[in-house]
Every structure is written in C-alpha cells, then in structure tokens.
A protein has these predicted regions:
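Preference for long, amphipathic alpha-helical scaffolds in soluble/luminal domains
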Residues: 1-220
C-alpha cells in the first residue's frame, strides 16, 4: 500500500528484527529456507506463503515448489489414490497455486510444460466445480485468499472463482477490518476433542456427535 512503510515504520522495523532473529535475515536467501524448514514436508502453508512473497515482489519464483496441478485433471475416483481429497486444503491450493507458479516459472522440461499448459482449462473447471456457492473454500479466509491471489497473479482476476472468492472475503470481513481464520470452527474443535478423548469418550455421546458432524457436511 502506498505510504504504508512510512506510516507503520515502527511496526515494520520490529517485524524485520523478529524475522532476522528467527531466520537470520529478511532476504529470500534467508526467508525461503526458513519457511520450508518450519513446515517440513507439509506444503499446505509453505508453498502458499512463498507464493504470496513472490507475488508481492519479496520472494523468488524459483523458491516456490511447483505443485502438480495437472493431476487434478484426472478422474475424481483417482483422487483418493493420489491423496487429493476434494474437500480439503489440498485440491483448491494445488490447482490455483500450481497454475500461478507454472505461469511465472514454467518447467524446463518441454513435455511437462506442454502437459501443464494443456491441463490448465480442465483444472480450472474442476476448481470452479468444487467452490462452494458462497465463494469460500472450507469457509476459510486463508485458503480462499491463497486461491484468489494466485488466480489474479496468473492473469485471471476476473475468473468466476476469483470473483466469488473476493465476494466471500468482502462478506466475511469484521468491523475492525480483520478476518477470522475460519468462519466456523465448531467442526474442527469437535473433531479435535473427539480425537483427544479417544476411547474415553462415553458411549452415549458418540451417536449424537456423529450425527451432528454428518449434518455439517457440504452436499453441493
């Protein structure tokens, strides 16, 4: 934002100081390895964060791991075998972020490059099909934002998925200008509690919880 650095110079300086202490510096040479190391093999957040940095001009596309979005063009009954569950963080981010990275730094392999170019339209159709009617993927602001910014970043700001994502973000912003991580955490908190209790969960409580969880499932 124009003037933001000057207006919030103290906050920016404090953030840079913290990052320098945690990662060793604030250049891509320091931040990219630190982000990847922080999340390990889980690319759910490291790849979107690095994509955001690259789109903002604070990172390098070579540091963004290419997600194989072309896999989303395969038949849906293959998704489980490929560990691509439809209702998860995996698929929307795979498609949008994968396409964005491919747009800015395509593979050196001509076969892979042609394959991904051919899969772009099909996988965008899949992304449109799995987007809920309110535009929010899993009712989650981070995921919806990652998808929306990636589509805009690869030249598709007016794509229906991007437009619905923006509508969701506008509709879910709080009065103070912030967003909740998710608009409804009850399902997540309930499943975490059930997993924590394990065999100690009373038998008479299991059926009501199971029925409630089933009612939360999207059926679009």
């Amino acid at each position: 934002m124009p003037g933001a650095l000057e207006e919030h110079a103290e906050v920016v300086a404090a953030a840079e100081q913290w990052l320098t202490k945690a990662a060793g510096g604030v250049t891509p040479d320091y931040l990219a390895p630190a982000i990847i190391a922080r999340y390990g093999k889980d690319r759910t957040f490291s790849v979107p964060i690095l994509t955001h940095c690259a789109l903002a001009g604070k990172g390098r596309w070579k540091d963004v791991i290419q997600l194989p979005f072309e896999l989303a063009a395969l038949p849906r009954n293959w998704f489980a075998a490929l560990r691509l569950p439809v209702v998860s963080y995996a698929l929307p981010a795979l498609i949008a972020i994968g396409q964005c990275r491919h747009q800015h730094r395509p593979s050196w392999n001509p076969f892979t490059r042609v394959l991904r170019n051919a899969a772009r339209e099909k996988t965008l159709q899949v992304l449109e099909q799995i987007q809920p009617s309110n535009g929010g993927f899993l009712e989650a602001t981070p995921l919806t934002s990652f998808v929306t910014m990636s589509l805009a970043g690869c030249g598709l700001p007016d794509h229906p998925v991007a437009r619905k994502g923006i509508e969701f973000l506008h509709a879910s912003v709080r009065d103070d200008g912030s967003w909740p991580i998710d608009t409804h955490l009850a399902t997540w908190v309930t499943t975490l509690s059930v997993n924590a209790l394990g065999e100690d969960l009373p038998d008479d409580a299991r059926a009501p919880i199971r029925e409630w969880l089933l009612k939360q499932q999207y059926r679009e």
